[in-house]
Structure formats: C-alpha cells, structure tokens
Amino acid sequence: MTSLKSDFLRIVTERGYMHQCTDLEALDKRLTEGCQAAYIGFDCTATSLHVGGLMQIMLLRWWQKTGHKPIVLMGGGTTRIGDPTGKDESRKMLTDEVIATNMAGIKTVFTKYLTFGEGKTDALMVNNADWLDKLNYIDFLRDYGHHFTINRMLTFDSVKLRLEREQPLTFLEFNYMLLQGYDFVELFRRNRCILQMGGSDQWGNIINGVELGRRADQAELFGLTSPLLTTSSGAKMGKTVNGAVWLNDDMLSAWEFWQYWRNTEDADVGRFLKLYTELPLDEIARLEKLEGAEINEAKKILANEVTRLCHGDAAALQAAETARQTFEQGVASSDLPTVEIPAAELAAGIPAFALFVRAGLAASNGEARRLLKGGGGKVNDQAVDEAHPVGSNDLRDGAVKLTAGKKRHILVKAV
C-alpha cells in the first residue's frame, strides 16, 4: 500500500504481517506524529515460547526499529485463568510457582530481539499480575462490567467453538476476555500505550480492549493482528513430528532450530524470509526466483538468518558448519542431537530397530523395521539389517551415528 506514510505500517504490510487493523488510516496518522507505545501479551504456559510466537516478537522488533516503544506484557495474572482462544477444552490450571518458572524462561528470548532500557524507544517488560492481583472484584464489576455484553461475547469464535461442540466453557475462562481488555486500558493509563497487536485469533479480545478504552477513558486505541500461519502443506508453525520448535536453546539446540528452517518447504521460503528475517525485499525477491537445487541455498540463508537472530552469530555459524560436515562430508559432528545409552546395554548389543525407537527416529518398532528395510535407516552412514546388533564395536570417537532419511541424525553415546 503506497499510501501508507508510517514506516512501521508500510513494512508490516509489504512483508506480510498485516491481517486486520481497527482503523488503519487513523493509526497511520498517529504513527507519523512521533514515538508511540504498543504491546503484545504472552501467557506463561511453558518455560519457552516456540516458533508459533516468533511473528509476534518480530512485530515488536520492527516496531522498535521504526522509532517506537515496544511493551512486552507477561501474563503472570491471566495465565492463572487460561486463554480459551483457539482451544476446544479447558487449559490445565497452573500453580503460581510453575507460572513464575515459565515466566523466567520466556523472558530470556526477548533480550535477543529487543533493546531494553530507559530510553524513549527502549523496550519495557511488564507483568499484568502487578495490577490484576490488586483488583477488587466488586469494584471491577461495577466499574467495567457494564461495558461488556454477553450478547457480543457469545459471538467470539473461541466461545462459539465450545458451545457448538457442547464443551464446557467455564466462567473463569469467560472472565479472561474482560481481563485482557482491562490490560489494554491499564497500559494506556500507565504508558500511554495506543496499540495492541497479536495473532488473528486474538481479534475479539483486542477489540474488547479498544472499545473499553473508548468507553472508560475516551481514549483512541488501536488493534492490529497478524495472520495465523501454516506451512504450505497445512502444518502448524512451530510443530514437528518430534514436538515443538522452542526458541530457548535449553529446550532445543541451535542446531535443531537451524535444521527446522533448513527443511522449509520450497513454496514457503520467500514468505518466511519476509516474516522471520530482516533481509531487504529485493534480495528476498532474488532468492524466491531460485529453482531446483538452487532453492537449497535460499533455505540455508533462511536458516542462518533466523538462527542468528534467535541464538546469535556464533551459534548460526556453528549450526551451518555442522550441517556442512554432516551432509556434505558425512562427518558425525559433536553438535548433533545426542542420546545416551548405558554402556552395558550397548556392549551386549541392541537390535538396530529398537535403537532407532529409543533414539526417537521412529515412533514404533514397526516403523523402525520398515525404515531399515527400505534403506532409509543407517548406522554410521551404512545401511544395516533391521535386527543388526548395534554394539560397542560400532562406536566411532565415542558415539554411534544413526540416520533416518536424508536429514535426521542422532548420536548415540555410551555412559
């Protein structure tokens, strides 16, 4: 959209972040009037965010790079309730101790993408427990309850989904929408925050906050959502057959993170380069045109750039070198994922199919047998019989390298 005047909206539109905006023209005007504050909320349901939340982090990064102040809202209060959005069943209730542990783990990733401090555009991290814990229930209902209608809330997709499936939606979860709306008003009062961003599934919750700000404080607030991404094959972003693709390196190694992006489907390379890297659009356009084997070079660039942002330059370079050694030279790099097996078991010999299952390269004995029979499973880069006993004599530099297909490698070490 060439008519957009603000750098932020122009960038997020050109790169594919934009899904909906409450008032694009008015927001564009506000963003040309100087530094503004925007926030995105993150509930603390695990000790790390995964790739599914990376687009939101990139939105905050672009917000800061274009001269504005990003606010990271940690949901220390709302996580106690659980966001029903996108869920067809109630979330598991978490204790305060678990929430605190999760929050500590999640916080670390933001320092890699944002600059925190006391400056005008420096990022700020806040916890909604700081104000939600102090709310008096009767006062909250009296002051804000009349601004929300059950009629409207029943139209939200997250509510309709539960009701249509005749699945319980607790009053506890129903209150989540009120509290998220109140968060926006509180951040406006404390930090003059005018914009809430989030995934498209949060549209209803964001609208609640925009409308509550207008009714309670006569404030002009805005909402902007990004699309919920799937891969070209329909898979959810951040999910693989082996589980979530975590952003914290204590949950997933930089090598495995790099591999996830290296294995991007051809049709997704250009889109992911726009969303998850800061490469110029003309360079991305060049990479998008690559075909055949050349597209693999674009995938390596994607993997390098995303890993660099998330784990640092050194980790990205090391992951790329591990890939080169593993795939181009056949060397079993020590940076490959590792599984430890008791030395006594390995000395006695473990059938290859059983070892593949224990290493997580196959979900069942049957799957492992088929993999090995078809030649897709290898031990130290050699095809073996499914019942071949893998033992101490197979150790190479203290490890046995298992391979499933062309891209999955595990080192088995005796302990």
Curated annotation (Swiss-Prot):
GO molecular function ontology, one term from the record: ATP binding
Keywords: Aminoacyl-tRNA synthetase, ATP-binding, Cytoplasm, Ligase, Nucleotide-binding, Protein biosynthesis, RNA-binding
Quaternary context: Homodimer.
Binding residue positions for ATP: 239
The protein's Enzyme Commission number: 6.1.1.1
NCBIfam families, per the entry: tyrS
Keyword Protein biosynthesis assigned: yes
Function: Catalyzes the attachment of tyrosine to tRNA(Tyr) in a two-step reaction: tyrosine is first activated by ATP to form Tyr-AMP and then transferred to the acceptor end of tRNA(Tyr).
Ligand binding (L-tyrosine): 39, 176, 180
GO terms classed as biological process: tyrosyl-tRNA aminoacylation
Top EC class of this enzyme: ligase
Descriptive protein name: Tyrosine--tRNA ligase
Taxonomy, superkingdom: Bacteria
Cited InterPro entries: aa-tRNA-synth_Ic, Rossmann-like_a/b/a_fold, S4_RNA-bd_sf, Tyr-tRNA-ligase, Tyr-tRNA-ligase_bac-type, Tyr-tRNA-ligase_bac_1
GO cellular component: cytosol
SUPFAM superfamilies on file: Alpha-L RNA-binding motif, Nucleotidylyl transferase
Entry similarity comment: Belongs to the class-I aminoacyl-tRNA synthetase family. TyrS type 1 subfamily.
Catalytic activities: tRNA(Tyr) + L-tyrosine + ATP = L-tyrosyl-tRNA(Tyr) + AMP + diphosphate + H(+)
Gene3D superfamilies given in the database record: HUPs, RNA-binding S4 domain, Tyrosyl-Transfer RNA Synthetase
Short sequence motif 'HIGH' region: positions: 44-53
Protein's cellular compartments: Cytoplasm
Motif 'KMSKS' region, chain ranges: 236-240
Ranges of residues in domain S4 RNA-binding: 350-415
